């Protein structure tokens, strides 16, 4: 599952889905859709592995649903892509109003503390080489997990960077 934001381009563009696999995402661009959708998927079929992709701003829209997951005994694996930004809005501002970027930087909570507070496994990934092992441990966790993937705002989407947007705008 995933919510809305530039982070969702990555799984939609680069993940392969098998015959019995599905990706649930919002058709209306709703931030915060991914975690509730992941929980609904687990309720529908508790035996299935459920993976939720969430941007940092996206997760903060409905992160309180971690309580629902705990209460209902659900165990999704949540990948939080943390670029400390509302990335889609930032991308549009850089492209359309390059000298007036405003209100897109965000301060995030300690996602590992949130994972611990709800009894979930938690890991923070800051280098690409750390991901595979962290992801495997998350998948193996019987309690569900949060894997926070710290990225640069510079890599605003798979198609462009902040630097490229500014260069195109002549700034």
Where are each of the predicted segments found?
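Active-site diphosphate/adenylate-binding microenvironment
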Residues: 1-42, 47
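Short gly/pro/ser/thr-enriched loop/turn and capping motifs at secondary-structure boundaries
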Residues: 8-9, 30-32, 59-60, 84-88, ...
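Short acidic, glycine/serine/threonine-rich loops at helix termini
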Residues: 10-15, 36, 63-65, 88-93, ...
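Glycine-centered short loops/turns at secondary-structure junctions
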Residues: 46-47, 73, 119, 142
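Glycine/aspartate-rich loop-and-adjacent alpha/beta segment that forms the canonical ThDP
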Residues: 113, 128-171
């Amino acid at each position: 599952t995933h919510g809305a934001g530039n982070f969702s381009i990555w799984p939609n563009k680069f993940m392969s889905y098998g015959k019995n696999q599905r990706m649930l995402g919002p058709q209306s661009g709703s931030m915060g859709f991914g975690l509730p959708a992941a929980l609904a998927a687990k309720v529908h079929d508790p035996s299935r592995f459920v993976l939720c992709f969430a941007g940092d701003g996206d997760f903060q829209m409905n992160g309180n649903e971690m309580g629902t997951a705990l209460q209902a005994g659900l165990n999704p694996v949540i990948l939080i892509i943390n670029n400390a930004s509302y990335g889609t809005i930032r991308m549009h501002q850089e492209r359309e109003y390059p000298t007036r970027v405003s209100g897109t930087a965000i301060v995030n909570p300690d996602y590992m503390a949130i994972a611990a507070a709800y009894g979930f496994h938690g890991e923070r990934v800051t280098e690409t080489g750390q991901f595979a092992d962290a992801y495997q441990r998350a998948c193996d966790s019987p309690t569900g997990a949060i894997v926070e993937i710290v990225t640069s705002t510079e890599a605003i989407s798979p198609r462009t960077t902040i630097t490229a947007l500014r260069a195109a705008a002549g700034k």
